[in-house]
From Swiss-Prot:
This is Large ribosomal subunit protein uL16c. Its main location: plastid. Keywords: Chloroplast, Plastid, Ribonucleoprotein, Ribosomal protein. It is found in: Plastid, Chloroplast. The keyword Cell membrane does not apply. Part of the 50S ribosomal subunit. The gene is rpl16. Gene3D superfamilies: Ribosomal protein L10e/L16 (3.90.1170.10). It holds the Pfam family Ribosomal_L16. Residues 1-20 are annotated as: Disordered. NCBIfam families: rplP_bact (TIGR01164). One of its GO terms (molecular function) is structural constituent of ribosome.
Length: 139
């Protein structure tokens, strides 16, 4: 699973997901991409599940880039604990994804294989996604 090696602070504010992605919304590395259409927190487990599904379907063909990284810690309190006594301990890591953000990119495979692989990966995501081809994506 992906997680930062070290961070400046152990715990983060939850924050808000306003607006659309202004960065990471264009295809840079590959020829095909999976783009988010909704705002969400995507956990490191979900990112890894999508990656595994795509690499298994492509059978070591082509190259895959993961364009998101889970750098936000999500804290949780123990079950049935009373209010107060501070914030819970970090349990897992999430990537904050806004609409328009590219999640994965692929290269070196046919469009049919890339489309099918990304459809399988999209089922692992908690959001609606869109398949993009480099030639048709807006600059």
């Amino acid at each position: 699973m992906l997680s930062p090696k070290r961070t400046k602070y152990r715990k983060h504010h939850r924050g808000r997901m306003k607006g659309k992605a202004t960065r990471g919304n264009k295809i840079v590395f590959g020829d095909f991409a999976l783009q988010a259409l909704e705002p969400a927190w995507i956990t490191s487990r979900q990112i890894e599940a999508g990656r595994r599904a795509m690499t298994r379907y492509a059978r070591r063909g082509g190259k895959l880039w993961i364009r998101i990284f889970p750098d936000k810690p999500v804290t949780m309190r123990p079950a049935e604990s009373r209010m107060g006594s501070g914030k819970g301990s970090p349990e897992y890591w999430v990537a904050v994804v806004k609409p328009g953000k590219i999640l994965y990119e692929m290269k070196g495979v046919s469009e049919i294989i890339a489309r099918a692989a990304m459809r399988i990966a999209s089922y692992k995501m908690p959001i609606k996604t869109n398949f993009l081809v480099k030639s048709t994506s807006p600059n």
